[in-house]
Amino acid sequence: MPYEILIPRQVERQIAKIPREFATRILDDLEGFADGLDYKRYDVRKVVDSPKTAPRYRMRSGNYRVLFFILHNRMVIEVISIRRKKTGMDY
């Protein structure tokens, strides 16, 4: 059973600013990940400094990074932000 993806209004605004081809790829990658939670295929990793009680994850999609929570008990992926990768590892 696939996970539901929650995208808050703030993140929708971020997506609207991204060129359409990249935004489509990001959303396709999110939907693919939600179907099977295949961490390796979609290059999903836990963010290093995230708390153990509510770990954050990041997904690489081209030059963009998607930050999100996975709420396993509710089968929900809640997107926090979508940003373009800078030269450093600062999100």
Regions found by a protein language model. Give the residues of each.
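A short, ordered amphipathic alpha-helix with a cationic face
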Residues: M1-P2, F33
